[in-house]
Regions:
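Bacterial N-terminal signal peptides that target proteins for export
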Residues: 1-8
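Short, glycine-/small- and polar/acidic-enriched structural segments
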Residues: 24-173, 177-184, 200, 208
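Periplasmic-binding protein-like
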Residues: 104-114, 194-220, 228, 232, ...
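Secondary-structure end/capping motifs
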Residues: 223-306
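N-terminal secretory/targeting leader peptides
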Residues: 85, 195, 201, 255-258
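Bacterial N-terminal signal peptides
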Residues: 8-17
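Sec/Tat signal peptide C-region and signal peptidase I cleavage site
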Residues: 19-23
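Conserved C-terminal helix/tail region of periplasmic/extracytoplasmic solute-binding proteins
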Residues: 294-330
Length: 330
């Protein structure tokens, strides 16, 4: 009898020790794209149990473009997601009720790629050409701004729907003339196209709005502020840890996504660090949406793309959940 009591107590102790410290709230987090180096901090924090320790059961869903992520979060299909901020502003004007809570790309990651042998030298040469990318790609939403900023008609190009993984093949086969991609996989285009690679960073062409930010469905945020506060603080800490020591961070990403290669994603991550750093992320807080920049981005979208309905830009973002002591290194 005594032995059974001891065994029962031991089993109960083991069960208690292995139970989560907090009841776990599931969060379905949709990415802007398939997992890559830029998503490493989420996988790192999840692997180390940082989210679970705060009562968050984080489910990371691969995405198919910022536009889709914005739509799903705006509609409440996903409570939280990752999307390009310019597209988020456009969607807000159409009624999508989302709030940005953490900025990842302080600099625009958008880039245009082509073959130099095609004769294209810059944006003005895109007129009459075919640009290929997925239908829900954030670059399509922002294209009118880039075109108008460079003095060409946004409708002067033809958009071709292709899968993300087919961009390079389509470019090489010359079934498209130009494609779009984020700067953090610039090294892949360099490797595949070599000296024939033509490239233009949007941030060097008069267009540098905030890039990817974490957005939350407004109604979900209203009822789950404590959860989002914990999520943001863990995520901010994870990004800072990955900047300081990227190797284990990238390894966590690769461990969770078997098809990825460490060397490729490590290079990807180092380019992400470039995109994360601006005056405000270095001096105010990593992840901040600075008021002046957000106002300028709103005016840019309003002028070049148009908003179905004007709104107060401060309604689409908040910095309240950030730890102001965590900054990008100077």
């Amino acid at each position: 009898m005594f032995a059974r009591t001891i065994l029962g107590a031991a089993a109960a102790a083991i069960a208690f020790a292995s139970a989560p410290a907090l009841a776990q709230q599931k969060l379905d987090f949709i990415l802007n794209w398939v997992p890559g180096g830029d998503h490493a901090p989420y996988y790192y924090a999840k692997k180390l149990g940082w989210y679970a320790k705060e009562g968050i059961d984080l489910n990371i869903e691969p995405g198919k473009g910022s536009a889709l992520a914005t739509q799903k979060v705006g509609a409440g299909a996903n409570p939280i997601g990752l999307a390009d901020m310019a597209g988020v502003l456009v969607a807000k004007g159409k009624g999508a009720d989302t709030v940005a809570v953490f900025n990842v790309y302080a600099n625009s990651p958008q880039g245009m790629y082509w073959l130099k042998s095609s004769g294209i030298k810059g944006v003005k040469d895109f007129v009459g050409k075919k640009i290929g990318n997925p239908a829900a790609d954030g670059a399509r939403v922002m294209w009118p701004a880039l075109a108008k900023a460079n003095g060409i008609d946004p409708k002067s190009v033809t958009w071709v729907n292709i899968d993300a993984n087919a961009k390079l093949a389509a470019l090489k086969a010359k079934s498209i003339d130009v494609t779009t991609s984020f700067y953090n996989i610039h090294h892949v285009f360099q490797r595949e196209l070599g000296d024939d690679m033509g490239f233009l960073a949007w941030r060097d062409a008069g267009l540098n709005p905030y890039g990817n930010s974490i957005i939350v469905n407004a109604k979900f945020l209203e009822g789950n502020r404590a959860t989002i506060d914990k999520f943001v603080k863990v995520t901010q800490r994870a990004f800072a840890a990955c900047v300081k020591e990227p190797e284990p961070c990238v390894q966590a990403l690769v461990d969770a996504n078997g098809a990825l290669k460490f060397d490729n994603e490590f290079t990807n991550w180092k380019l992400v660090e470039v995109l994360m750093s601006d005056k405000f992320s270095r001096e105010m807080a990593l992840g901040i949406h600075e008021d002046g920049r957000m106002k300028a981005d709103y005016e840019l979208v309003k002028e070049y793309i148009g908003l179905d309905k004007p709104f107060d830009v401060k309604a689409v973002y908040t910095n309240e959940f950030l730890d102001r002591s965590i900054k990008m290194p100077k």
